[in-house]
């Protein structure tokens, strides 16, 4: 059943590593292009407007955006799992109903996020207590960013559907177009029209609109069960319930990560504008890692979902082992590259000596800890691909969120410094990885299968 693309890798048969690599590479490149939106905003604002604008879009705003968008991406993963399982099982009717339910759901959620984001931007940012010279820029950027939530949600859901049926290339092509558009619009609105942070946010929202238009146009013309027709846009209550049951815990897990990071951002804000700008630069560089990590997770989840639908548990275990190898190799390479290029990369964002010094110090603190996170991404993605979304959320709650909060209030706030902020990350990654490893090794994580022995 190859409705999506006759050239797509076969997720159910053939060599696991080569097929996963073919599927993963376009997702990775697309994820990096999405991150490029944010990095272009930061470079343009840092160079043309100043460090206050850089701190505004990369600090509190980024923490809030990651929280909200992360929740939807987690929620959308439930739809992708349902589509991939029915696609793997060869159930065209269920795939068709799932696609239309998912797209309609993304429109509704996007509209709600737009209203809440625009209305609550100021009170939420005031609560986070950013440096006074960044507050108004932060509010303007966030409100304009949330104005583009509907196309952003539609694109992410539509691209997820294409990937769920094995087509990871077309979402990449769309993002190439949109990355070029975002760069051109950034220069037009910020350098040309002098709109500052508002111009950067408008450029990002318009780029997301282009992405959404391309993915809807593709789904409306794709042959087979995934074809989108306006007349069939309605909720299938049973499928929506399954999507929510799988996606809601994943969304909550993302919210828990982001909520803890919002509190960390509050601690960073207490250190002043230089520290806020330095951490903002680090987040932009660190932001290169997470899209690739997430791309490996999407690959593992999609392959697992289709093979779970096709009842191939042994192939699922091969997928997990391959995913761990891919993630560990990438993490080690990223850690080394980030450390070796620390001065060069930080100077791309600013010429301010104080900000450069703090940014380089932060990189030295955290660069070599990324491999610790591997088990979290791969095991949680495999479990969600099999429909087990609750336990990954529980493990994330205890290993990451509660422990991170405990460290914040017992170590970070009483002894506030860049070091006590940084230590929260590797400590909680390690704890959560250990919990996932124990659960995978000794418990029944795959519905309908026996635990490992």
Regions found by a protein language model. Give the residues of each.
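Short alpha-helical transmembrane segments in multi-pass integral membrane proteins
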Residues: 1-24, 83-148, 184, 192-248, ...
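Residue-level signal for short hydrophobic patches within transmembrane helices
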Residues: 13, 17-36, 40, 64-71, ...
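Transmembrane helical elements of multi-pass membrane transporters/channels
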Residues: 22-41, 144, 155, 178, ...
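Helix-terminus/linker motif at the lipid-water interface of multi-pass membrane proteins
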Residues: 32, 36-55, 125-132, 188-195, ...
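Alpha-helical transmembrane segments of multipass membrane proteins
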Residues: 39-42, 115, 123, 157-161, ...
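Interfacial/gating helices of multi-pass transporter permease domains
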Residues: 45-66, 133-137, 197-198, 239-246, ...
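Small-residue-rich hydrophobic transmembrane alpha-helices
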Residues: 54-115, 152-171, 278-342, 373-396, ...
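Short runs within selected transmembrane alpha-helices of multi-pass transporters and secretion channels
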Residues: 76, 80, 145-163, 171-182, ...
């Amino acid at each position: 059943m190859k409705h999506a693309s006759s050239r797509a890798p076969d997720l159910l048969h053939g060599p696991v590593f080569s097929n996963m690599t073919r599927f993963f590479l376009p997702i990775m490149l697309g994820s990096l292009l999405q991150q490029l939106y944010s990095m272009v905003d930061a470079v343009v604002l840092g160079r043309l407007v100043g460090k206050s604008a850089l701190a505004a879009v990369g600090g509190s705003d980024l923490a809030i955006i990651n929280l909200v968008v992360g929740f939807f991406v987690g929620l959308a993963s439930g739809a992708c799992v349902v589509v991939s399982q029915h696609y793997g099982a060869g159930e065209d009717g269920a795939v068709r109903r799932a696609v239309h339910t998912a797209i309609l759901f993304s429109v509704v959620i996007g509209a709600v996020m737009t209203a809440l984001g625009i209305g609550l931007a100021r009170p939420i940012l005031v609560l986070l207590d950013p440096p006074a010279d960044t507050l108004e820029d932060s509010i303007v950027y966030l409100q304009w960013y949330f104005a583009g939530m509907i196309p952003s949600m539609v694109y992410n859901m539509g691209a997820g559907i294409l990937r769920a049926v094995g087509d990871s290339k077309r979402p990449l092509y769309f993002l190439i177009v949109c990355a070029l558009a975002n760069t051109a619009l950034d220069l037009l609105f910020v350098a040309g029209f002098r709109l500052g942070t508002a111009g950067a946010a408008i450029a990002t929202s318009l780029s997301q609109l282009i992405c959404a238009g391309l993915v809807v146009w593709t789904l409306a013309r794709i042959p087979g069960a995934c074809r989108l027709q306006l007349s069939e846009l309605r909720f299938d209550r049973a499928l929506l319930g399954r999507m929510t049951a799988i996606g809601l815990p994943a969304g909550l897990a993302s919210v828990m990560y982001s909520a803890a990071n919002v509190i960390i951002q509050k601690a960073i804000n207490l250190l002043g504008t230089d520290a806020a700008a330095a951490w903002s630069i680090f987040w932009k560089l660190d932001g290169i890692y997470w899209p690739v990590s997430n791309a490996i997770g999407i690959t593992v989840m999609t392959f697992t979902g289709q093979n779970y639908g096709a009842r191939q548990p042994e192939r699922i275990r091969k997928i997990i082992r391959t995913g761990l190898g891919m993630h560990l190799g990438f993490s080690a390479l990223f850690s080394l590259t980030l450390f070796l290029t620390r001065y060069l990369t930080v100077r791309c964002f600013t010429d301010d000596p104080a900000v450069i010094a703090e940014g380089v110090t932060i990189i030295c603190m955290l660069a070599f800890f990324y491999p610790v996170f591997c088990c979290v991404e791969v095991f949680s993605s495999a479990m969600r691909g099999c429909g087990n979304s609750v336990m990954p959320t529980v493990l994330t709650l205890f290993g990451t969120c509660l422990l991170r909060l405990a460290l914040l209030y017992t170590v970070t706030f009483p002894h506030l410094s860049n070091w006590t902020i940084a230590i929260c990350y590797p400590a909680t990654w390690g704890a959560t990885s250990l919990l996932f490893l124990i659960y995978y090794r000794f418990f029944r994580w795959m519905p309908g299968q026996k635990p490992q022995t």
